[in-house]
Amino acid sequence: MANIRKSHPLLKIINQSLIDLPAPSNISTWWNFGSLLGICLGLQILTGLFLAMHYTSDTLTAFSSVTHICRDVNYGWIIRYIHANGASMFFICLFLHVGRGIYYGSYNYLETWNIGIILLFAVMATAFMGYVLPWGQMSFWGATVITNLLSAIPYVGTSLVEWIWGGFSVDKATLTRFFAFHFILPFIITALVIVHLLFLHETGSNNPTGLNSNADKIPFHPYYTIKDILGFIIMFLFLMILVLFTPDMLGDPDNYTPANPLNTPPHIKPEWYFLFAYAILRSIPNKLGGVLALILSILILILMPLLHTSAQRSLMFRPIGQCLFWILVGDLFILTWIGGQPVEHPFIIIGQLASIMYFLIILVLMPLAGILENKIMKL
């Protein structure tokens, strides 16, 4: 009689995805981030569920309900801070996961890559709406500024913004619908994650060399389950250090002031994980141009497979491509820093140069490096 995990209709799927899955023998720690993202998502849904039990999505009580969670609910403070800082861990893992995909040419698995981009947009939308919920100053003004960007759309822009707001400004209707969407989106994300994995398991995982690894596969369990558990422990260690020692390090002090539509904070900025895109948005003086650049800064990932000119899949044996990749990483750090700075000299020009570099590296220099490396290989 066959083992139950191999014969049971439901356990069979889990077995083929997590236990007997043939995995390349040489995948490095960079392949840990997929499972870490799964853990982050589960953690966010769990902590979010407990927060939703005590939160009220009303402009009059939202701020005080968050205070109530921190002061009066049993371990409410730690649930709230795990949720808030868990989002930061989520984005750290997300950026490293996407970076790994770019470095090792994983974007050549088209379906997996495109679902991943949809997931990135969905997670960003969820995080943005979650930031609005505590109804502090930065929540309110962040929501006002970001939703207002849609008014740059010709002809229908203003109507679209008022439709999203549910009125003529960010108010009770906006907060209520943002809470509803913030609650439902993680479950949609979970469904998309399953599709993401489904497409990945059609082709099997990529590996650092970018070569076909069918001749050398090992079972996922116990090798990579143990490796993933080590990753979980390290991530939880970092998360708990953040939560227990400096829970407000990544937040904004302005969010401890209740939302006031009559008082604008001196520097409106989103959470740190959106700052690179925010810097690109601000570097273009035209409103519509800025919005398009903001969207393109993420949508550019769709073009990755089309811009791949190299005969090799991975950057592992491509020194010129590697240099450009790490310059791009440095450029993203500069953009993140600029996004948090006031709009004044010299930050404006630095942001504009960094934005030009971002698009130049991805659209022009990386494809040219691929062509050049192909020619060097033939010498």
UniProtKB/Swiss-Prot annotation:
One example of a Gene Ontology biological process annotation: mitochondrial electron transport, ubiquinol to cytochrome c
Residues where heme b b566 binds: 97, 196
Effect after changing residue 228 to G: In strain: Isolate 2
Stretches of the chain forming a coiled coil according to its record: none
Record text on cofactor binding: Binds 2 heme b groups non-covalently.
InterPro entries attached to this UniProt entry: Cyt_b/b6_C, Cyt_b/b6_C_sf, Cyt_b/b6_N, Cytb/b6-like_sf, Cytochrome_b, Cytochrome_b_C_euk/bac, Cytochrome_b_N_euk/bac, Di-haem_cyt_TM
GO molecular function: metal ion binding; ubiquinol-cytochrome-c reductase activity
This protein's UniProt keywords: Electron transport, Heme, Iron, Membrane, Metal-binding, Mitochondrion, Mitochondrion inner membrane, Respiratory chain, Transmembrane, Transmembrane helix, Transport, Ubiquinone
Sequence positions that bind a ubiquinone: 201
Protein's cellular compartments: Mitochondrion inner membrane
PROSITE patterns named in the record: CYTB_CTER (PS51003), CYTB_NTER (PS51002)
Function recorded in the entry: Component of the ubiquinol-cytochrome c reductase complex (complex III or cytochrome b-c1 complex) that is part of the mitochondrial respiratory chain. The b-c1 complex mediates electron transfer from ubiquinol to cytochrome c. Contributes to the generation of a proton gradient across the mitochondrial membrane that is then used for ATP synthesis.
Subunit structure: The cytochrome bc1 complex contains 11 subunits: 3 respiratory subunits (MT-CYB, CYC1 and UQCRFS1), 2 core proteins (UQCRC1 and UQCRC2) and 6 low-molecular weight proteins (UQCRH/QCR6, UQCRB/QCR7, UQCRQ/QCR8, UQCR10/QCR9, UQCR11/QCR10 and a cleavage product of UQCRFS1). This cytochrome bc1 complex then forms a dimer.
Family named by the database record: Belongs to the cytochrome b family.
PANTHER family the UniProt entry points to: CYTOCHROME B
Protein name listed in UniProt: Cytochrome b
Source species of the chain: Myospalax psilurus (Transbaikal zokor)
Classification lineage: Eukaryota, Metazoa, Chordata, Craniata, Vertebrata
